[in-house]
């Protein structure tokens, strides 16, 4: 893929962030998601690529746009798989919380796992602890391994996990081990990425969340030199049947190369609300400001991009709830 595609994808996540940010704290997650999705779809039409959505807003009969199988781009350029989450953390934005993002991952055609929309058990770490974690090992063993890799005591390790009833046992084990815990209400893509940046204070991600988000996280962590390991967790016979039809082995531990093959991949995200990693959208008069992250796996280059947007010249993004 052309390296210039990186900045084209930032334009897409910026548009989705600007369009949805007006809904912050207004309690209307569906409207916010619709705004992000529509803006993202519009800008995709200008991107020089021949893209196919492999992870999106649902099947063709479930979503009006950015559905699985939809063609994206202007029809020129590389043939790529596209994974999108137009608004990672709809509940976060609706309540005015932290870490809402707009997210895209693009990779060579046929290299992204077409993850079904179901739960995935996950464990993720940054570069210092790659090769140390085991998704089937006890919590305490993983904590000790990460502590050793990062030259810390277990009591100094910070684990992040979605604050869900299904995670009560893991949270109890983390507390019993003496680790520090950062509970997150939504948005485990941000939680996974945070493990790769020292200033976020996060060392390891535990727990289950969406499988599509696991693939998005894998692209980011591959580019950052980190690691995520997953295992599909179907919750019904229907989901089990769907996995079998897709040829997915439910007993298989999914490692980085299973989630995203090779290193010709790009990850882009823009903050919608403030978070540990990215500042959220700010508005002042006719100007909107954004902070984005774009990472290219092939080169390992990480860029933080500050954007200042004249909303007078982007009337389609001026949304008044």
Curated annotation (Swiss-Prot):
Associated pathway: Carbohydrate biosynthesis; gluconeogenesis
GO molecular function: fructose 1,6-bisphosphate 1-phosphatase activity; metal ion binding
Main localization of the protein described in the UniProt heading: cytoplasm
Cofactor(s) listed: Mn(2+)
Effect of deleting the gene: Disruption of ywjI alone (or fbp alone) does not affect growth on various carbon sources. But the ywjI fbp double mutant is unable to grow with carbon sources demanding FBPase activity, i.e. glycerol, malate, and a mixture of succinate and glutamate.
Binding of substrate, residues: 88-90, 119, 164-166, 186-188, 210
Gene Ontology CC, one term: cytoplasm
Activity control: Inhibited by phosphoenolpyruvate (PEP).
This protein's UniProt keywords: Carbohydrate metabolism, Cytoplasm, Hydrolase, Manganese, Metal-binding
SUPFAM superfamilies: Carbohydrate phosphatase
A matching Pfam family: FBPase_glpX
The protein's role, per its UniProt record: Catalyzes the hydrolysis of fructose 1,6-bisphosphate to fructose 6-phosphate. Can functionally substitute for the FBPase class 3 (Fbp) of B.subtilis.
Name of the protein in question: Fructose-1,6-bisphosphatase class 2
